[in-house]
């Protein structure tokens, strides 16, 4: 399984050393940009921890536990946001539902009727089914509110024996202090252009090394972003966006309508719509960074800052039409 974790060799060795010395922490916070492999790493770690042989965190691939993950043929996990269902009875996974702004407390401690008798905190405290520990993965840790964080505190402070909790977010700055201070922080760097290009070619996403390198550089180390760039209509989208961004007259209403149409064309899939808008704003960021080399660098810097703010709102689950309208109006000022 570890051979499929590319670009994070140092972190793999760090965990192996800690495990070999019996000093593995009970709570971790994985941080890094979306698409650099944090979640894939977390599942590989879970497979190694739950393996019955536990050989230097290398899953054997043949024990009862490893077979639940796919055995020796396990390469990566088929998950997509909150729709993912854990393949293992001692592995628990939760993430923010697409229609929620925060991680619901019910996922952590159960609803009001079952409070304290359901949810991740309760499940991880129970006796392991396969007698080899438990692992809990909390995706979207950026979206804890105070209520959810308080529900998790006791479990973070006193993890059950043989249990490991892994929280996944994008940066420590987005974590509540009560969460951040109780976890060992593991920072994931963006994938290098060489590593990301090789992955794109290996997966058949890029048809050549040159094409893979081009997308890898534009994606800034994110596999998710590179996949979006590989979409057949990205070049036309970039051309269309550049035409509007360089126009002498900025029509905020028309721009907002255009962007809303591009997002709504993807249907009701909220994560997909959010990724599309993130891609559009990412292309705008690239444009403004290049524009800053021109004479009017101050205006480009202002527009870049407003676009980065819009990206932040997309990641914070703000209503997309509102984000689009606010961005188009903001860019229209001083055009």
Residue ranges of model-derived segments:
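Charged, glycine-rich active-site and insertion segments that engage polyanionic ligands
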Residues: 1-48, 54-56, 68, 161-164, ...
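Clamp-loader machinery-focused feature within the broader ASCE/P-loop NTPase space
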Residues: 2-147
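Short, structurally constrained coil/turn elements
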Residues: 85-87, 159, 179
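Short, well-structured alpha-helical patches and their helix-loop capping segments
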Residues: 112, 116, 133, 144-148, ...
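Conserved catalytic/switch belt of AAA+ P-loop NTPases
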Residues: 150-164
């Amino acid at each position: 399984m570890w051979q499929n974790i590319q670009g994070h060799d140092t972190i793999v060795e760090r965990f192996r050393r800690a495990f070999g010395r019996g000093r593995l922490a009970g709570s971790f916070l994985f941080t890094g940009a979306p698409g650099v492999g944090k979640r894939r790493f977390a599942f590989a770690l879970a497979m190694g921890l739950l393996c019955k042989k536990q050989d230097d965190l290398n899953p054997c691939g043949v024990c009862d536990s490893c077979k639940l993950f796919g055995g020796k043929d396990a390469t990566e996990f088929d998950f997509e946001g909150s729709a993912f269902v854990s393949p293992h009875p001692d592995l628990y996974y939760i993430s923010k539902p697409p229609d929620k702004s925060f991680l619901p407390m019910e996922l952590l401690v159960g609803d009001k009727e079952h409070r304290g008798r359901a949810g991740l905190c309760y499940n991880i405290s129970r006796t392991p089914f396969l007698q080899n520990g438990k692992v809990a993965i909390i995706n979207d840790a950026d979206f804890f509110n105070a209520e959810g964080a308080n529900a998790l505190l006791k479990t973070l402070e006193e993890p059950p024996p043989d249990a490991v909790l892994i929280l996944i977010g994008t940066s420590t700055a987005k974590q509540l202090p009560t969460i951040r201070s109780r976890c060992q922080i593991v920072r994931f760097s963006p994938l290098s252009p060489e590593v990301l290009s090789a992955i794109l070619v290996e997966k058949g996403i890029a048809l050549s090394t040159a094409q893979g390198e081009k997308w890898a550089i534009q994606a800034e180390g994110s596999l998710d972003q590179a996949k979006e760039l590989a979409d057949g209509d990205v070049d036309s989208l970039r051309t269309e966006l550049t035409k509007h961004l360089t126009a002498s007259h900025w029509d905020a209403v028309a721009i907002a309508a255009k962007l809303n149409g591009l997002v709504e064309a993807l249907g009701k899939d909220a994560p997909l719509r959010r990724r599309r808008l993130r891609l559009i704003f990412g292309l705008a960021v690239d444009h403004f960074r290049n524009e800053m080399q021109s004479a009017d660098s101050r205006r480009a810097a202002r527009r870049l800052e407003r676009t980065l703010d819009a990206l932040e709102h997309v990641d914070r689950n703000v209503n997309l039409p509102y984000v689009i309208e606010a961005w188009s109006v903001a860019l229209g000022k001083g055009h």
